């Protein structure tokens, strides 16, 4: 019995660690595409941009993290001054929570896809952020 209680306690500890680096946060979602702004061909670090990549503030969302939207997952590989200073959230947010939201700039392969997605989804949404620690623990 004592061993069972110890095993259950140990499992609970592992489960808590598994979810320790998963968080949900309110984000202002913007879009960019090839040829628009700095998204010509590569991210700031030389990574070739593809669909399912996004730009984030690395101080708030580490590079390599997965940002989970209601319809897709993106990997944080890029950054930019408007993302870091949260210009889109500060100018469009009506409530304090919206003005303080992180900005996630989602990359699309074409302008048409980006604008279609932006028109059919809200400007602010709750996204889940999975850091690499969560991914490694899950494998």
What feature does the model see in each segment?
Residues 19-139:
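Solvent-exposed, well-ordered loop and adjacent helix/strand elements within mature globular domains
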Residues 1-7:
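Positively charged n-region of N-terminal signal peptides that target proteins for export
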Residues 7-15:
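Bacterial N-terminal signal peptides
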């Amino acid at each position: 019995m004592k061993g069972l209680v110890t095993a259950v306690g140990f499992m609970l500890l592992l489960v808590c660690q598994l979810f320790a680096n998963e968080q949900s946060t309110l984000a202002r979602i913007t879009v960019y595409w090839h040829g628009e702004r700095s998204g010509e061909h590569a991210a700031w670090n030389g990574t070739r941009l593809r669909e399912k990549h996004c730009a984030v503030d690395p101080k708030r969302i580490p590079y390599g993290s997965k940002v989970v939207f209601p319809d897709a997952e993106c990997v944080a590989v890029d950054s930019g001054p408007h993302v870091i200073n949260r210009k889109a959230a500060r100018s469009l947010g009506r409530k304090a929570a919206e003005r303080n939201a992180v900005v996630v700039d989602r990359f699309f392969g074409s302008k048409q896809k980006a604008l279609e997605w932006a028109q059919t989804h809200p400007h602010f949404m709750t996204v889940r952020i999975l850091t690499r620690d969560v991914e490694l623990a899950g494998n």
